Structures are given as structure tokens and as C-alpha cells.
Regions:
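Conserved catalytic core of the tyrosine transesterase superfamily
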Residues: 1-305
Length: 305
């Protein structure tokens, strides 16, 4: 509301102490929102947040000042602006395979980097969830799982596959992470024994992505990589394999399945395969028998004259 008062003072030349309800109409609010977008260079989400605050104020005000009810209702009817969904960038199965082939597993660091990328993909973890992983969060014996701390400190337990278990186990042996007293240690750490940072993880991914792209320019179609692309890749690959969307929601730790639905829009072929699996082939190329009956068609034509 402070920004609205500033707008009324600077653009409408009405200081806050003289401002009355009659000075603010629905058109004024619409102009204010447009002014915010042009001068504040705010996103659609921020614009909608400002409008939500105005709506909240006017919902209260209409009960206290019913004389202005009509105009307040017009203000409350101002719609939120829709925003287009961002494109989901992800690695294909082939790209993911080529990326994981890059680390040199003949040395400790290469095995660490491979284990890190395998965990990031296999669990669909957010980069911060990976950073926060401790040794105690890994269960290597069957059923092998990783416990992730997501947004709002919500915990979720996700399975990891056999190949990933072997990679992580070998890495933990290399760095003596299975010994007593290491349970609270970060699973992945730098040379100082501290948690890896987001830029550090991005550096690791970019290093091997560039190697993979240089060695396989025709197979690596993506131009760049960031940690969230591995999370997107896991979700899309699960969907391609026919995994239920509700399970993918729980696997990724989404609060709503609406968020998970963005993966249904990733590519035309994926949407086509999902539709073909779930909908019967109603349309056929067969010509109904009555179309071949020329006498019947002639009778219908004569009847309609």
C-alpha cells in the first residue's frame, strides 16, 4: 500500500493526508499496476502480489465504509495477470548417459563427482537438498534410500537404484565416510571439509557437460546445464516410463500436483504417447455402410428438397 500512496502523491498529486476513498477508482488501480510494471520493472508475480494486497485491504474496507461499496467491488474485480509457464529444460536419457560417462573414475575426485551427479539425478533432488545431505541421510542396504530435507523443512525419503548405491558406497569408502563419528558430516564436501556450495556444484556439472558436448556434439542438443535440469530430467524420464503423476509429485516433494503438471507439456512426442496410452482410438478410417448406399443418399437428398 505504501507504493500506492507514493503513486497517488507523485502521479496524481494527492498527498496521503488528503487522500480519500473517492479519489481511488478501479481505473486508478489499473493505472497504478501499469505504472509499477513500467517504472519498477517488476515481474508478473510481483505485480499480482501488489494487487492481492490491494484486494485484501478493500475486502476489509468495504465492511467499514459501505458508502463506497460499488467502487470497491469494481476494484476487487480487477483480475490477476496470467503468466506463461516457463519452458522446462532437461537432459534426454542419451544426454544424461553421456554426461555420467565423463568423470575419470580412476581417481577419488572423479568417483566423487560421478556419485554426486548420480545422486542428483537419481533422487531428483534440488541443489540445496543435495548440499544439505549428511552421511546419516544415506541408507545403502536394501531398500536403499536417501532422506532429503525440502522446502519448509519437509522431509521425504526417496529410493536410489542399485548402480547409484554402488557409486556412492565406493565414494564413501574412498573418503572414509562409513566410519563411526562421520554420521553428521556432509556427504559431499570441498577440500576444507565444508559443504559444497551451489557455485561449486554448478562448476562440476559444467565441467563434465562441456566435455560431453565436445566429444558428442551431435548427441548433446542442450546448450547449457544447471543442477535443476537433472531434477527436470528425472521427472520427465519417469513420466516417459509411465510412472503416475501423483507418485512423481511425492517423489519431487511438490506441494501440489499442479506444479508437477508442467512436465506434461515438455515435448510433443511425450504428450502424444501419454494420450495414446490413456485414450481409445475412437476415430477410424472405415467408411460407414450407409455412405456406400447411393440409393439411400439420393432418397435423403430428395426428402430434404
Amino acid at each position: 500500500m505504501r507504493q500506492l500512496l507514493t503513486y497517488m502523491r507523485d502521479e496524481k498529486h494527492i498527498p496521503p493526508e488528503r487522500l480519500e476513498f473517492k479519489d481511488i477508482k478501479a481505473e486508478t488501480i489499473a493505472e497504478f499496476l501499469l505504472w509499477l510494471e513500467k517504472n519498477g520493472q517488476i515481474s508478473i508475480s510481483t505485480r499480482n502480489q501488489r494487487l492481492a494486497a490491494i484486494h485484501s485491504f478493500y475486502r476489509y474496507a468495504q465492511t467499514e465504509y459501505p458508502d463506497n461499496l460499488l467502487e470497491m467491488q469494481r476494484i476487487l474485480s480487477i483480475p490477476f495477470k496470467k503468466k506463461s509457464r516457463p519452458t522446462v529444460n532437461y537432459l534426454t536419457k542419451e544426454e544424461m548417459k553421456l554426461l555420467l560417462e565423463q568423470p575419470d573414475v580412476r581417481n577419488h575426485k572423479g568417483r566423487r563427482d560421478l556419485a554426486l551427479m548420480a545422486i542428483l539425478y537419481d533422487t531428483g533432488a534440488r541443489v540445496q537438498e543435495l548440499i544439505d545431505l549428511c552421511v546419516k541421510d544415506i541408507r545403502l542396504h536394501a531398500p536403499a534410500t536417501v532422506t532429503l530435507k525440502g522446502k519448509g523443512n519437509k522431509m521425504r525419503c526417496v529410493p536410489i537404484m542399485g548402480n547409484t548405491v554402488q557409486l556412492v558406497s565406493r565414494y564413501m569408502d574412498d573418503y572414509n565416510l562409513k566410519s563411526n563419528g562421520r554420521q553428521q558430516s556432509p556427504l559431499f564436501f570441498n577440500s576444507r571439509g565444508e559443504k559444497l556450495t551451489r557455485p561449486g556444484i554448478c562448476y562440476i556439472l559444467n565441467k563434465y557437460f562441456k566435455q560431453a558436448k565436445k566429444a558428442n556434439p551431435e548427441s548433446i542438443l542442450s546448450d547449457r546445464i544447471h543442477p535443476h535440469m537433472l531434477r527436470h530430467a528425472k521427472a520427465v524420464h519417469m513420466l516417459e516410463s509411465g510412472v503416475n503423476l501423483i507418485y512423481i509429485r511425492d517423489f519431487l516433494g511438490h506441494a501440489s500436483v499442479t506444479t508437477t503438471e508442467i512436465y506434461l507439456k515438455t515435448e510433443t512426442e511425450l504428450k502424444r504417447s501419454v494420450l495414446e496410452k490413456n485414450y481409445p482410438d475412437v476415430v477410424t478410417q472405415d467408411i460407414p455402410e450407409w455412405r456406400n448406399d447411393t440409393d439411400l443418399l439420393q432418397w435423403l437428398n430428395d426428402f430434404c428438397r
